[in-house]
Regions:
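Flexible, compositionally biased loop and terminal segments
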Residues: 1-125
Length: 125
């Protein structure tokens, strides 16, 4: 199903849906630090050059046009992120829903989008 969805939307560039399966935010940060350390070790990066952009370029989401999601939707009724997108979620709008992922329907997505649209985004202000 995901392969068909990916193929059907391969030329679509306006919005992106990311589904994280077996993802760990701490592992992502460890992997990013290792990549940066390797660059320092091989001389392609100086410690003084480490900045926000360098860190973001080593995260799992670095291939996306926008690595920070506008909205994060958490199903299952849990009101926490559990380390999900630890770096990227800083300015994301968080939507928590009581429904479990397998029962998630189009109407649930529409409700989440409507909730998101009603919010006033301050982006850290």
């Amino acid at each position: 199903v995901l392969r068909r969805l990916d193929d059907a939307t391969k030329d679509y560039k306006n919005h992106f849906l990311n589904i994280a399966i077996a993802y760990g935010g701490q592992n992502e940060l460890v992997d990013a630090v290792k990549k940066i350390a390797e660059k320092i070790k091989d001389g392609s990066l100086n410690v003084d050059e480490i900045d926000k952009k360098e860190i973001e370029s080593n995260l799992y989401t670095s291939h996306l046009p926008q690595s920070s999601p506008d909205m994060i939707l958490r199903t299952s009724g849990e009101k926490r992120l559990s380390g999900f997108l630890m770096w990227q979620s800083a300015y994301s709008e968080l939507i928590f829903m009581d429904i479990y992922w397998p029962e998630f329907r189009k109407i649930d997505l529409m409700r989440a989008i409507r909730t998101f649209q009603k919010r006033k985004r301050r982006i850290g202000k």
